[in-house]
Amino acid sequence: MRVLGIETSCDDCCAAIVEDGVKILSNIKLSQKEHKKYYGVVPEIASRLHTEFIMSVCQQAITNAQIHASEIDLIAVTSKPGLIGSLIVGVNFAKGLSIALKKPLICIDHILGHLYAPLMIKKIEYPFLSLILSGGHTILAKQNNFDDIEILGRTLDDACGEAFDKVAKYYKMGFPGGPNIEKLAKNGNQYAFNFPITIFDKKENRYDFSYSGLKTACIHQLEKFKDKNENITKNNIAASFQRVAFENLIIPIKRAIKDTNIKKLIISGGVASNLYLREKIKNLEIETYYPPIDLCTDNGAMIAGIGYLMYLKYGASPIEIDANSRIENYKHTKGKTV
């Protein structure tokens, strides 16, 4: 079965053709450079550019896959969560294409796409732990199947990638913040600033994360946390921030490993491409899996891949289905999440 996957939840306009859930025939992504001068994504600009480019991006995906549009068997599209204007563009385009081609439509949760991305490259036996790190989400989950997910912890404020973007914006390090901070950090002292690590000890929050305190310390309280022998430089700020941002993740992950006795972890989302993070995770001495870089960030292939499985199990979505900006509450739930 050939699936066209469409992803427009934020500022990347993506489309891909995937066969039987794992064979990627094409994977096209158009990143919107217009946001760089604002040091962040402007929702109105994002939705307007999606409207402008979505048809050509989908056509390129079909062309690169060396198929005709009539050979598409299913259309999968991200319908939640994300920027509502961007989501509406993708969902409405997918609906129109579904009607025009007389092909079934399945609406997919963006989070499920990220969780599935590593499995497109390597077969991993369930259950395993999953960590999603992106500009919009920081989620630690236990996965028993592709549609059986228990959220163990999530950020209580800023997402990990969001904190990177905000710190980078304040110090004019460039957008997106993640890759630019990682680059600057290579020439900095990661112990120049002793920023606070936020860990929750209450049972109901023991797997949760928080980045607002770190962000505030890094932006407004540099002198308070500076080593007296170090200078305030962008490189030192970046290196120290990056170290603590990822140390914030380690203790909840260790707790989840101990409590579930699961020794397998998959990590996805844009922040998962950070090489410093990957070195930190190595110290956990467990089986760790990452998707390739082009599947870490938002992409249409992961939507097509999980769309194939969801369609086989649950069938098509009703054509009346709408986009939804809110994140699904998966905690202790199982079943249809479209």
Curated annotation (Swiss-Prot):
Sites where the protein binds Fe cation: 110, 114, 298
Domain of life, source organism: Bacteria
Listed cofactors: Fe(2+)
Cellular-component GO terms for this entry: cytoplasm
Pfam families according to UniProt: TsaD
Annotated substrate binding sites: 132-136, 165, 178, 274
GO BP terms, alphabetized: tRNA threonylcarbamoyladenosine modification
Co-factor note (free text): Binds 1 Fe(2+) ion per subunit.
The enzyme's E.C. designation: 2.3.1.234
Subcellular localization: Cytoplasm
Ranges annotated as spanning the membrane: none
Alphabetically ordered keywords of this record: Acyltransferase, Cytoplasm, Iron, Metal-binding, Transferase, tRNA processing
Reactions the enzyme catalyzes: L-threonylcarbamoyladenylate + adenosine(37) in tRNA = N(6)-L-threonylcarbamoyladenosine(37) in tRNA + AMP + H(+)
SUPFAM superfamilies: Actin-like ATPase domain (SSF53067)
The UniProt record lists the keyword Iron: yes
Cited function: Required for the formation of a threonylcarbamoyl group on adenosine at position 37 (t(6)A37) in tRNAs that read codons beginning with adenine. Is involved in the transfer of the threonylcarbamoyl moiety of threonylcarbamoyl-AMP (TC-AMP) to the N6 group of A37, together with TsaE and TsaB. TsaD likely plays a direct catalytic role in this reaction.
Xref: PANTHER family: TRNA N6-ADENOSINE THREONYLCARBAMOYLTRANSFERASE, TRNA N6-ADENOSINE THREONYLCARBAMOYLTRANSFERASE, MITOCHONDRIAL
The protein's name in its UniProt record: tRNA N6-adenosine threonylcarbamoyltransferase
Lineage of producing organism: Bacteria, Pseudomonadati, Spirochaetota, Spirochaetia, Spirochaetales
